[in-house]
Amino acid sequence: MDGNVLLAFGLTLFAGLATGVGSLIAFFTSRTNTKFLSLALGFSAGVMIYVSLVEIFVKAKDALTNALGNTNGYWMTIAGFFGGMLFIALIDKFIPKSSNPHEVKLVEDVNAIKPQVNEDHLMKMGIFTALAIGIHNFPEGIATFMSAINDPNVGIAIAIAVAIHNIPEGIAVSVPIFFATGNRRKAFKLSFLSGLAEPVGALVAFLLLMPFLTDVMFGIIFAGVAGIMVFISLDELLPAAQRYDETHLSMYGLVGGMAVMAISLVLLV
């Protein structure tokens, strides 16, 4: 178990640090490769949706039906699944639209923002975006950590998928802060800090959830994780992938992500 805990923390840290990668891309490239980003985000959504519905939801149902019986266990699984969706939806609800990490940002936005825009406003926008992404990343950290504790292979897949979708979030933080301050280091630091919410989520899961991890608690948490992952995929990843490129690339990425996840689960059984 100790080895799994260390791996789980490492995976959440890896996923969170991808926001810093996004800010570096914004600073050191002149154009956004929208086709690649669309394909990658679609792939990330495919991995998340497939592993959530085929692996995580099923494990949650098995744990709850074993503990509560078939009928009660299945109802509790459904409640946990949609409870996870409601949880992440409420987080999104209270994030201001201008700071929402769902808003697509491009590297070109660094040069596209007009100089007459108030710099204080841009700075506030960047800080609010960093806070919003931090809040948004917190439950993702819990989800990645708990998945890795139960099955490291599933945890690795989820961490990679989360890392991919954290890259454009890093761009969303760094663009307004860089333009407001002209300071790459400050923009990178705030982007980096927003990503640390994921390992903080993992730490909370370890300290508050792990000591009480009965079969019922495990099943409810895993059902909630599945709901969170599916909601993020449908509400964030796929729409963003389609906005980056309006062809079928996002759907090809989605199917590819599902296929890779399906094959890897079979090979790793």
Swiss-Prot record:
This protein's UniProt keywords: Cell membrane, Ion transport, Iron, Membrane, Metal-binding, Transmembrane, Transmembrane helix, Transport, Zinc, Zinc transport
Pfam families: Zip
Residues binding Zn(2+), per UniProt: E140, H165, E169
Any one annotated GO CC term: plasma membrane
Superkingdom of origin organism: Bacteria
Location(s), subcellular: Cell membrane
Family as reported in the entry's similarity comment: Belongs to the ZIP transporter (TC 2.A.5) family. ZupT subfamily.
NCBIfam families: PRK04201.1
Protein name: Zinc transporter ZupT
